[in-house]
From Swiss-Prot:
Domain IQ: 68-97, 124-153
Entry's localization field: Cytoplasmic vesicle, Secretory vesicle, Acrosome
Protein name according to UniProt: IQ domain-containing protein F1
Any one GO molecular-function label of the UniProt entry: calmodulin binding
One Gene Ontology biological process: positive regulation of acrosome reaction
Span list, region Disordered: 1-68
GO CC annotation terms, alphabetical: acrosomal vesicle
This protein's UniProt keywords: Cytoplasmic vesicle, Repeat
InterPro entries per record: IQ_motif_EF-hand-BS (IPR000048), IQCF (IPR039887)
This protein's record includes keyword Hydrolase: no
Keyword Ubl conjugation set for record: no
Function: Involved in sperm capacitation and acrosome reaction.
Annotated coiled-coil segments of the chain: none
């Protein structure tokens, strides 16, 4: 409103100069106080504007820190992955080594068991063979003794008869596995008499 109403300016005269010289002291004090009052407001507005700018635009340092954090997390994740893979590989190799060792031990154990089974079977087989051979030998010997006893009885009988008839008896025999071949020659006064006979054995298999 004050700008629209022009005021008439009076040209200063020489008489008014001393009054104008005295007035600046009072005016300077008022202007200085007004300037001092306005400066804090300007400072406050500048700080608020700077704060708004800071809140709107994050500083480059924070961006760098966030980038560093992401890179660090990536490196840590990679290192953890390598550690886990290394541990898994070590565990797999250890398991493979243990399996190979256990397979070798099992093969040795099975080989020993087979060897022991073969030895036991061979011992049993040999024992059975020896028992069978001993039994056969005992049976044949007993039959041989029976035949020999019979031959001796026959010889004694013929000797007694030859003595009674004043003759002479001569004979021979041959024993095989199944029968007895007997051949007797009796010499009497009337003439020789030859007797041959085959006596089979009753062998039960």
């Amino acid at each position: 409103m004050e700008e629209k109403q022009p005021q008439k300016t009076k040209e200063p005269s020489k008489e008014d100069e001393p009054q104008q010289k005295e007035m600046p002291t009072h005016l300077s004090l008022g202007a200085e106080s007004k300037a001092e009052a306005k400066t804090p407001v300007l400072v406050e507005t500048q700080t608020v504007d700077n704060a708004n700018e800071k809140s709107e635009k994050p500083p480059e340092n924070q961006k760098k820190l966030s980038d560093k954090d992401t890179v660090a997390t990536k490196i840590q994740a990679w290192w953890r992955g390598t550690l886990v893979r290394r541990a898994l590989l070590h565990a797999a190799l250890s398991a493979c080594i243990i399996q190979c060792w256990w397979r070798l031990i099992l093969s040795k154990i099975l080989k020993k068991r087979r060897q022991a089974a073969l030895e036991a079977f061979s011992r049993k087989e040999w024992a059975a063979v020896t028992l069978q051979s001993q039994a056969r030998m005992w049976r044949i010997r007993r039959r041989y003794c029976q035949v020999l006893n019979a031959v001796r009885i026959i010889q004694a009988y013929w000797r007694c008869r030859s003595c009674a008839s004043r003759g002479f008896i001569k004979g021979q025999y041959r024993v095989t596995a199944n029968q007895l071949h007997l051949q007797l020659e009796i010499l009497l006064d009337s003439g020789p008499c030859i007797v041959t006979e085959c006596i089979p054995f009753s062998i039960k298999e």
